[in-house]
């Protein structure tokens, strides 16, 4: 995920044959006392299960009992297409930036997008880059691809036909859309994906700046993300705002003198994976997922859960994220390379709060070790974390689409965490997701997220999980060029004055 401001879209994706990989679920139960595997049962969302307020909101956009099943089917089909598109985005970003297959200079994708569009005539720009909220398809002939980019793409197309020991390259080689194609056909497909990805980047990074008002620009970018491919991008920084949100919960529990550790049954939706991000690709580090481990660390550090009671389930639409998390506890070497995506520089120093968070990160779940960085990354904070087997064995994952599905467990969740997932959803999809989340939470359970879309508050209220608190956190910067993230806390309750988990859980 790329950091900009609270609620900014940053980005979690899949192959186009999901059913083959649905068998790769919940294979991990590492300790004798470990709870049952993630999501004992997954069910499709039914119209009758929606809250009355949610039904009313959906009816305003033409979704009712008669066409609900068709709507769910359409969303599932669109999700599969967007997952494949997101994987192709990762492929393009890897091809432009990686040094694992070429000695050519890395190319920053946003800069490449700008150079590509700079070649267009005014008529082409008007057709391809208009600033309506629903941009039309744009076709740019491959001959327009700048030579430096074309050279990298050609070399990458050849590499995809060769044996490789690089984990990311191996993954791209096995994408069904590219498998068994000739070098020429692979180059043609990769070029087409490059043009599509660059068009989106230009719209987001440059066309959006043509608006006079921030609200109009935000609406334009939001519309772009509701159509783009699903990304698994994530960074270590993502955990900071969630930690601060959990700290607020802990402080309130202390102030209320609440007894018991009530946040031991946790669900993370879309934990993501650092695979091939749009910027700052670290291809010398294997693909990793950080968030489940960071959340476990925060819960234990803040004494919101006892180590022997922790259950941390994860659901993601991308099977490679699920596979990583389910296989992690089996590894002989359970290490995570934690590298901050932000450099600590004079012109934009890391905040004291974030630096303290990174220093303490992982101390409650494992043993930190030193990590030597390349010279050009020495201004970044980094460490190697060896995760304890007992903790790794309490993290489970399963493939699921929270818009159209929900988990059914013997005990509902105490806490659900969602970061940088909601921006990809339309209003209808967001309403459905919030209803599914509410159904998976116990009465008094909490939802933490970092989406700032204004309509979310009313949609969450209609789903029965009203907002109770929000806060903004400074990650880096001083008075100018500052970098923020934020967290909102919601609670499933029928009593407006109840703002902290209590006896309603029946525990």
Where are these regions (language model features)?
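A short glycine-rich, Lys/Arg-flanked "PGG" loop and its adjoining helix->strand segment in the class I
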Residues: 431-443
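Conserved Class I S-adenosyl-L-methionine
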Residues: 346, 458-490
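Class I SAM-dependent methyltransferase Rossmann-like catalytic core
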Residues: 197-263, 281-285
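Conserved beta-strand signature within the Rossmann-like core of class I S-adenosyl-L-methionine
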Residues: 443-452
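Bacterial N-terminal signal peptides
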Residues: 13-30
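A short SAM/SAH-binding and catalytic strip from SAM-dependent methyltransferases
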Residues: 414-428
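A short acidic, Gly/Pro-enriched loop at the edge of an enzyme's catalytic core
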Residues: 404-416
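Class I S-adenosyl-L-methionine-dependent methyltransferase module
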Residues: 45, 49, 55-66, 70-217, ...
């Amino acid at each position: 995920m790329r950091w900009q401001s609270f609620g900014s879209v940053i980005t979690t994706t899949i192959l186009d044959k999901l059913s083959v990989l649905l068998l790769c679920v919940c294979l991990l139960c590492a300790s004798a006392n470990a709870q049952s595997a993630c999501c004992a049962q997954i069910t499709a969302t039914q119209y009758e299960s929606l809250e009355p307020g949610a039904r009313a909101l959906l009816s305003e956009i033409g979704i009712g009992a008669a066409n609900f099943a068709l709507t769910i089917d359409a969303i599932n089909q669109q999700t599969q297409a967007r997952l494949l598109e997101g994987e192709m985005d990762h492929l393009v970003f890897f091809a432009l930036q990686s040094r694992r297959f070429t000695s050519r200079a890395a190319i920053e994708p946003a800069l490449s997008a700008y150079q590509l569009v700079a070649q267009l005539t005014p008529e082409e720009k008007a057709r391809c880059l208009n600033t309506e909220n629903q941009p039309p398809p744009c076709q740019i002939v491959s001959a327009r691809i700048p030579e430096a980019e074309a050279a990298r793409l050609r070399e990458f197309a050849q590499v995809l036909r060769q044996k490789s020991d690089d984990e990311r390259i191996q993954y791209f080689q096995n994408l069904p859309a590219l498998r068994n194609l000739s070098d020429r056909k692979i180059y043609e497909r990769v070029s087409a994906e490059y043009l599509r990805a660059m068009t989106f980047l230009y719209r987001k990074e440059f066309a959006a700046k043509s608006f006079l008002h921030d609200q109009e620009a935000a609406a334009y970018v939001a519309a772009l993300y509701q159509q783009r491919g699903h990304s698994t991008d994530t960074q270590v920084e993502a955990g900071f705002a969630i930690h601060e949100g959990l700290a607020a919960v802990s402080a309130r529990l202390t102030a209320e003198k609440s007894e018991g550790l009530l946040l031991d049954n946790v669900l993370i939706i879309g934990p993501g994976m650092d695979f091939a991000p749009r910027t700052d690709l670290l291809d010398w580090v294997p693909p990793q997922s950080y968030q489940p481990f960071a959340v476990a660390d925060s819960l234990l550090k803040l004494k919101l859960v006892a180590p022997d009671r922790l259950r941390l389930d994860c659901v993601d639409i991308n099977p490679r994220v699920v596979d990583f998390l389910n296989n992690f506890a089996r590894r002989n070497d359970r290490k995570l390379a934690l590298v901050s995506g932000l450099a600590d520089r004079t012109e934009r120093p890391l905040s004291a709060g974030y630096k303290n968070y990174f220093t303490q990160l992982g101390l409650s779940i494992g043993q930190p070790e030193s990590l030597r960085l390349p010279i050009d990354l020495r201004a970044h904070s980094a460490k190697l974390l060896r995760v304890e087997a007992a903790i790794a064995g309490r993290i489970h994952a399963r493939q699921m689409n929270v818009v159209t599905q929900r988990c059914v467990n013997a005990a509902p969740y105490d806490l659900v965490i969602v970061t940088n997932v909601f921006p990809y959803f339309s209003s209808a999809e967001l309403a459905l997701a919030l209803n599914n989340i509410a159904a998976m939470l116990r009465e008094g359970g909490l939802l933490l997220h970092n989406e700032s879309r204004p309509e979310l508050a009313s949609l969450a209220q209609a789903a029965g999980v009203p907002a109770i608190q929000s806060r903004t956190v400074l990650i880096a910067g001083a008075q100018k060029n500052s970098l923020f993230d934020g967290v909102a806390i919601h609670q499933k309750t029928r009593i407006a004055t109840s703002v902290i988990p209590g006896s309603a859980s029946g525990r």
